[in-house]
């Protein structure tokens, strides 16, 4: 976060009977800028000035001023070259008629309704966050209550993060509590089309122990018939500092949303509804010394999707609904050291397992017709 320190030089003197013209003291100012420290594009915390790529940072103050339950509208406003598609007052949905497509500098996703983003990677605390079966991010899962700040690497990052980062990388850094004490924040808003957004967060730090618990509920009827959206979710994070150099933390986030797609005005749809549940959890042990730093982390993401593709006026309702389950888990270890000025050596290992299964459930009989069932493993050392 950029901090701006102002030093005002005040020129004064003893009171005198003779008036004397002096310059305006407030016009003499000095501004000092403290650069941001980021973790995107490198494993360890690094001054953004020392990175060979372009990284933009959105801080917590900017997130709170925007007062939006989703991070994407905020990022579209603050990040140059980032574009996202939208379709209504709240929510993006999935499958046909979905929005939330992302692109950076024209690369990432196809700006067409219903087509997923495949060239933009979203991370939470450095862990990949996308559907394990389809391989695309779920835009409604990236909520403002999670984020302490958001770091956006603009431009190709496939060497660091894989082929699904051709457009860039969005890294959501989760909330922290730096000072001792208890902080509770609540926010409720109500507006047009029966739109409600609410959030409550409690943060505690007592000595070496920290905790964060957040919950939210958001809904809207939408500006068209059959365009309702409802979402509720929760986030919890616990941490413990063993010393000034070693810390352990773990977190869990679960969100569920119901989204309806009315189709186009020319060709409306009936009962095109989706019921989506997404979850993620992670555990990390970190060390920070003057000359070296590193971490061992584990993460697990999962999802459950139920989708009714709906039908057009004059057609028959769907006789079966699409269902899917997906997961993604991984282990990451790295250690970075500096031996002399301008040098840094990092060694590490990453393992990821992802995949899932899909099926169509016949409504009349409950029969399950299998679709895709795929699992994959990836590992690499560096």
Language model segments and positions:
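Short, acidic, small-residue-rich periplasmic hinge/interaction motif at the N-terminus
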Residues: 20-64, 72, 288
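Non-catalytic regulatory/gating segments with a bias toward low-complexity or hydrophobic composition
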Residues: 55, 63, 75-76, 150-152, ...
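Extracytoplasmic beta-strand/coil segments of soluble accessory domains associated
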Residues: 76-127
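Short acidic/polar hinge/loop motifs at secondary-structure boundaries
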Residues: 119-120, 126-154
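Short strand-turn segments of transmembrane beta-barrel domains in outer membranes
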Residues: 169, 174-204, 214-215, 220-225
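Outer-membrane beta-barrel channels and translocator barrels
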Residues: 179, 206-209, 243-245, 255, ...
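Flexible loop and strand-edge segments within Gram-negative outer membrane beta-barrel domains
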Residues: 220-227, 231, 245-328, 366, ...
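Outer-membrane beta-barrel transmembrane domain signature of Gram-negative proteins
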Residues: 319-382
């Amino acid at each position: 976060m950029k901090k701006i320190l102002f030093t005002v030089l005040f020129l004064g003197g003893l009171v005198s009977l003779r008036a004397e013209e002096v310059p305006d003291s407030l016009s003499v100012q000095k501004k000092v800028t403290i650069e941001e420290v980021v973790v995107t594009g490198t494993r360890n915390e690094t001054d953004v000035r020392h990175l060979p790529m372009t990284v933009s940072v959105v801080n917590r103050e900017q997130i709170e001023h925007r007062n939006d339950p989703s991070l994407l509208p905020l990022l579209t406003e603050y990040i140059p070259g980032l574009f996202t598609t939208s379709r209504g007052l709240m929510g993006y949905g999935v499958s046909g008629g979905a929005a939330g497509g992302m692109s950076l500098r024209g690369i990432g996703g196809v700006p067409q309704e219903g087509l997923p983003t495949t060239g933009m990677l979203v991370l939470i605390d450095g862990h990949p966050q996308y559907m394990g079966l389809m391989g695309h991010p779920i835009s409604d899962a990236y909520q403002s209550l999670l984020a302490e700040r958001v770091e956006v690497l603009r431009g190709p990052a496939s060497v660091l993060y894989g082929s699904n980062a051709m457009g860039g990388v969005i890294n959501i850094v989760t909330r922290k509590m730096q000072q001792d004490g208890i902080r509770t924040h609540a926010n409720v808003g109500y507006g047009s089309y029966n739109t409600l957004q609410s959030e409550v967060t409690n943060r505690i730090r007592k000595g070496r122990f920290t905790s964060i618990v957040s919950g939210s509920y958001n809904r809207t009827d939408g500006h068209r018939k059959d365009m309702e959206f409802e979402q509720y979710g929760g986030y919890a994070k616990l941490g413990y500092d063993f010393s000034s150099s070693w810390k352990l933390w773990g977190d869990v986030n679960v969100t569920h949303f119901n989204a309806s797609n009315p189709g186009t005005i020319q060709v409306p749809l009936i009962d095109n509804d989706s019921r989506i549940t997404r979850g993620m959890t992670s555990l990390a042990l970190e060390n920070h010394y003057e000359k070296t730093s590193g971490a061992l982390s584990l993460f697990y993401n999962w999802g459950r999707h139920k989708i009714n593709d709906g039908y057009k006026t004059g057609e028959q309702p769907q006789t079966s609904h699409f269902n899917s389950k997906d997961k993604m888990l991984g282990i990451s270890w790295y250690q970075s050291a500096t031996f002399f000025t301008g040098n840094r050596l990092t060694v590490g290992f990453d393992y990821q397992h992802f995949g899932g299964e899909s099926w169509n459930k016949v409504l009349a009989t409950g029969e399950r017709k299998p679709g895709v069932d795929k699992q994959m493993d990836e590992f690499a050392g560096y």
